[in-house]
């Protein structure tokens, strides 16, 4: 174990600051600097409780639709006119440009080298807890790492590698994926989740938006946004937290007043993700939250006929009502679907042009649906 230094942005000298955060030697310690002052910035928020959320739509809705989350109103004085997005700001050597499609995330451009990163801002008194999962996890190619931390008087600016869009937006634009591509990407998703579980971290609010592309070719994925994960003590993965996205929530979270297995709940979310990749919509959907949760509790869903038998088998192995009957994340990686789809010469079966494209979701009623 070692303690990361806090360096002054002006002098470069190490300075003590508050309780020390221990960094495991298994993962690189991010560089840290200290600012004299900092600008106001938004703080990443947890997903609301399920009881406070409306349901997600059937299909993956485009931005601006009634079923898409509306961006929060801009703070007074931020940006140009009323309701406009916050404008650029300068933090040390970086120019921060808020991303309209990624709440609480900014593009960070180094004014000296032109290097582009991503930046998140946290209150200074909470930032060590926020970045602790990144520090605890051993390095993994499918999990994002911290590049640098800059400390202001009241806020911490945490920098990550640049990405090329998230999986949710990608699936929405593609309608649904062929099995070969879905298998290649889903295997990376499961690999990241298995690595977290083996390192005593449960993700909790697991969904497609948390996976971003590492390359412009969109062939490599990595998991981001570990701030709201749960660090386990030993083998006990019992959770009582009810935060999450309605489309991905497991039956036991809805039925249990006490605790539930966090790892098993993550696996259910993986099942929702795989179904969505292959079908282009969620397995459980309804505009009424009560009806949606009732469908999830029953665990009944339909798989289109064009999905291969092995893919259907894997989906059903993940979306089991009984948590103990689900595969574990490491077991998913051994499922024969991956080998059968990714082997040379595999031909994806399609049953017709009309079945290859999932139509845009149409919502007649004017509801404010919570969407993750």
Curated annotation (Swiss-Prot):
Result of altering residue 371 to L: In a lung large cell carcinoma sample; somatic mutation
GO biological process terms on file: negative regulation of JNK cascade; negative regulation of lipopolysaccharide-mediated signaling pathway; negative regulation of MAPK cascade; negative regulation of neutrophil differentiation; negative regulation of smooth muscle cell migration; negative regulation of smooth muscle cell proliferation; negative regulation of transcription by RNA polymerase II; positive regulation of eosinophil differentiation
Cross-referenced SUPFAM superfamilies: Protein kinase-like (PK-like)
Molecular function GO terms recorded: mitogen-activated protein kinase kinase binding; protein kinase binding; protein kinase inhibitor activity; RNA polymerase II-specific DNA-binding transcription factor binding; transcription regulator inhibitor activity; ubiquitin protein ligase binding; ubiquitin-protein transferase regulator activity
Record-linked Gene3D superfamilies: Phosphorylase Kinase, domain 1, Transferase(Phosphotransferase) domain 1
UniProt keyword annotations, A-Z: Protein kinase inhibitor
SMART domains hit by this protein: S_TKc
Keyword Cell membrane: no
Location of the Protein kinase domain: 91-338
Segments for region (Disordered): 1-23, 52-86
Protein name: Tribbles homolog 1
Species annotation: Homo sapiens
Gene: TRIB1
């Amino acid at each position: 174990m070692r303690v990361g230094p806090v360096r002054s942005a002006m002098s470069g000298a190490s300075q003590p600051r508050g309780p020390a955060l221990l960094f495991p030697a298994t993962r690189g310690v991010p560089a840290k600097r200290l600012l004299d002052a900092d600008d106001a910035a938004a703080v990443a928020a947890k997903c609301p409780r399920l009881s406070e959320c409306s349901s997600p739509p059937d299909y993956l809705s485009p931005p601006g639709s009634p079923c898409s989350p509306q961006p929060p109103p801009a703070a007074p004085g931020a940006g140009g006119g009323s309701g406009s997005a916050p404008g650029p700001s300068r933090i040390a050597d970086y120019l921060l440009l808020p991303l309209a499609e990624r709440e609480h995330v900014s593009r960070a451009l180094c004014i000296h080298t032109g290097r582009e990163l991503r930046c998140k801002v946290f209150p200074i008194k909470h930032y060590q807890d926020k970045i602790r999962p990144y520090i605890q996890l051993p390095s993994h190619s499918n999990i994002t790492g911290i590049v640098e931390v800059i400390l202001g008087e009241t806020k911490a600016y945490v920098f990550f590698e640049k990405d090329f869009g998230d999986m949710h937006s990608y699936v929405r634009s593609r309608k649904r994926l062929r099995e070969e591509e879905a298998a290649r990407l889903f295997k990376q998703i499961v690999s990241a989740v298995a690595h977290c579980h083996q390192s005593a971290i449960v993700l909790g609010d697991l969904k497609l938006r948390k996976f971003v592309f590492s390359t412009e070719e969109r062939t490599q994925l990595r998991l981001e946004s570990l701030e709201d994960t749960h660090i386990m003590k030993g083998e006990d993965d019992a959770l009582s937290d009810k935060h999450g996205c309605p489309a991905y929530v497991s039956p036991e979270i809805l039925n249990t007043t006490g605790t539930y297995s966090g790892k098993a709940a993550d696996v259910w979310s993986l099942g929702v993700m795989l179904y969505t990749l292959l079908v282009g919509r969620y397995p459980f959907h309804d505009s009424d939250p009560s009806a949606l949760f009732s469908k999830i509790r029953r665990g009944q869903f339909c798989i289109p006929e064009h999905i291969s038998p092995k893919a259907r088998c894997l989906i059903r192995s993940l979306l089991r009502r009984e948590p103990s009957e689900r595969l574990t994340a490491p077991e998913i990686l051994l499922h024969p679907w991956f080998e059968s789809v990714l082997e040379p010469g595999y031909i994806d079966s399609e049953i017709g042009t009309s079945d290859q494209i999932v139509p845009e979701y149409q919502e007649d009623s004017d509801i404010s649906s919570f969407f993750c």
